[in-house]
Design a protein with these regions (language model features):
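Flavin (FAD/FMN)-binding glycine-rich loop and adjacent Rossmann-like elements that form
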Residues: 40, 65, 70, 110-111, ...
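Beta1/beta-strand and adjacent pyrophosphate-binding region of the FAD-binding site
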Residues: 1-11
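Conserved N-terminal/central alpha/beta ligand/cofactor-binding core
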Residues: 20, 26-27, 32-116, 120, ...
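Alpha-helix N-cap/helix-initiation motif
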Residues: 10-11, 85, 133-136
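Loop/turn elements at helix/coil->beta-strand transitions in domains of secreted/extracellular proteins
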Residues: 2-4, 24-27, 104-107, 140-141, ...
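Buried hydrophobic packing segments
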Residues: 17-21, 152
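Membrane-embedded transmembrane-helix bundle of lipid-linked glycan/lipid transferases
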Residues: 6-8, 17, 122, 140-142
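N-terminal Rossmann-fold NAD(P) dinucleotide-binding loop
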Residues: 14
C-alpha cells in the first residue's frame, strides 16, 4: 500500500507533521516505536515550555494546542514559575492522540521498528518496519523524519542541515544575520543551542533532621 505522506517518529515535530498533513487531505501514515505521542511535550515531561510567552508566536498548530489545553483546564495553565503556561504531560498526550484519531486520512501504527530502506537515486522508495509482530513494506510519496535521533535520515544517508541558519536563508527576523554567524564567537562555541544548566547536589552522611514546622 502506498501513502501520500509517511512520518517516522511521533515526537513533537512528527506528531504535528502527521496531523497537519492529514488535515490538508494527504493520506498519511504515522509510525512510532512507542505507544505515546508528543515527545518532549509528553513522554519527556517538558510541559512548561519556555520562550513562548509572546502571543505572536502562539500561531498555527502550536497556538491551537495551547488554546485547546487552556479551554479544557478549569485551573488554567498559568501556575508555574518556569513559563507563562504549563500543563500535565498526560494532557498533551491525550490531546495529540485525540487529534490523530479524529482524522480519517491519518493512520497511526505504534510499536514499530525501522528495519530497512530502499532508495532509487536520491529518493526513498519504501521502508521495511517490524510492527505488531510482522514485517511490513511501506511505500510513500513524501517522507518525514519526526524521530528524536534522525533514524530515517541516517538510514537513507540523506543530506541534512545542522546548526544555526542565517537570517538571509529564510527571512527569519529573529535569526542572526550572516555577518554575525561568521564573526561572533558565540555561534561557533554554541553551534546548536545555548546550554541548559542543571545544578545537582549530593548529600553525604546522614540526612538532615526533618523540620517540625508545618507549611
Amino acid at each position: 500500500m502506498s501513502w501520500d505522506v509517511v512520518v517516522w517518529g511521533g515526537g513533537t515535530g512528527g506528531a504535528a507533521a502527521a496531523v497537519q498533513a492529514a488535515r490538508k487531505g494527504a493520506r498519511t501514515l504515522l509510525l512510532t516505536p512507542g505507544p505515546w505521542l508528543g515527545g518532549m511535550l509528553s513522554a519527556a515531561g517538558v510541559c512548561a515550555p519556555d520562550g513562548h510567552e509572546l502571543s505572536c508566536w502562539q500561531t498555527g498548530l502550536w497556538g491551537q494546542f495551547i488554546r485547546t489545553l487552556a479551554d479544557e483546564s478549569p485551573e488554567g495553565l498559568d501556575h508555574n514559575w518556569v513559563s507563562c503556561f504549563g500543563f500535565r504531560p498526560e494532557q498533551a498526550e491525550q490531546l495529540l492522540q485525540r487529534w490523530v484519531m479524529q482524522l480519517p486520512s491519518l493512520e497511526w501504527r505504534s510499536g514499530c521498528e525501522l528495519l530497512d530502506l530502499q532508495r532509487r537515486g536520491d529518493r526513498i522508495q519504501s521502508i521495511q518496519v517490524g510492527c505488531q509482530g510482522s514485517t511490513q513494506t511501506i511505500h510513500g510519496a513524501q517522507w518525514i523524519d519526526g524521530s528524536d535521533l534522525g533514524d530515517l535520515i541516517a538510514m537513507a544517508d540523506a543530506p541534512y542541515r545542522w546548526g544555526w541558519e542565517a537570517q538571509e536563508t529564510w527571512n527569519e527576523p529573529s535569526a542572526p544575520d550572516r555577518r554575525r554567524l561568521d564573526q561572533d564567537a558565540f555561534f561557533t562555541e554554541q553551534p546548536v543551542q545555548s546550554p541548559t544548566w542543571v545544578v545537582m547536589g549530593q548529600l553525604s552522611g546522614e540526612c538532615p533532621a526533618q523540620s517540625s514546622q508545618t507549611p
